[in-house]
């Protein structure tokens, strides 16, 4: 695209971090998430769509460590504006293992990451000073019965997967 503008191209980056103590790959590290975010910045600089790895866990099993590592890097990838994410779900042991159950967990995790990327919409309707006034000053003191709350539950709250 830099040579011939308009020519379709995807900037495929694949940075990996090594544990400096052992030399082993550390796909679930915070540094890996930072490198993927840095790749997104390069993609924007060159005005090309691109991808990088995120969602990899160093953990060998779908446990808390795996969830933490996968969530951190997937949210970082989303917030940095990465166009494509390789290995976004299911990958363990720094790409040496794969877990089908982690695909299910990853689906929920990626949904939460995408919700973070969407951000908070601030408009006259979403600030809802009239609803705040009616609830806090004249009403029950909570929003659980509010029509607006019931409507927003469908778009603003992502529930856990029910299996």
Where are these regions (language model features)?
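Glycine-rich anion/phosphate-binding loop at the beta-strand->alpha-helix junction
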Residues: 1-109
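Catalytic-core signal marking the mid-to-C-terminal active-site face
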Residues: 101-161
């Amino acid at each position: 695209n830099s040579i011939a503008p308009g020519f379709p191209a995807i900037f495929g980056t694949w940075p990996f971090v090594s544990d400096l103590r052992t030399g082993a790959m550390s796909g679930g590290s915070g540094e890996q998430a930072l490198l993927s975010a840095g790749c997104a910045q390069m993609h924007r600089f060159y005005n090309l769509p691109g991808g990088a790895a995120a969602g990899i866990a160093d953990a060998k099993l779908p446990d808390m460590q795996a969830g933490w590592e996968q969530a951190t890097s997937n949210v970082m990838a989303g917030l940095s504006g990465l166009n494509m994410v390789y290995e976004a779900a299911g990958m363990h042991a720094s790409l040496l293992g794969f877990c089908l159950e982690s695909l299910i967990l990853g689906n929920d995790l990626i949904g939460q990451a995408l919700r973070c990327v969407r951000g908070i919409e601030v408009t006259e309707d979403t600030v809802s000073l009239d609803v705040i006034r009616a609830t806090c000053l004249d009403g029950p003191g909570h929003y659980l019965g509010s029509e607006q709350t019931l409507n927003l539950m469908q778009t603003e709250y992502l529930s856990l997967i029910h299996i």
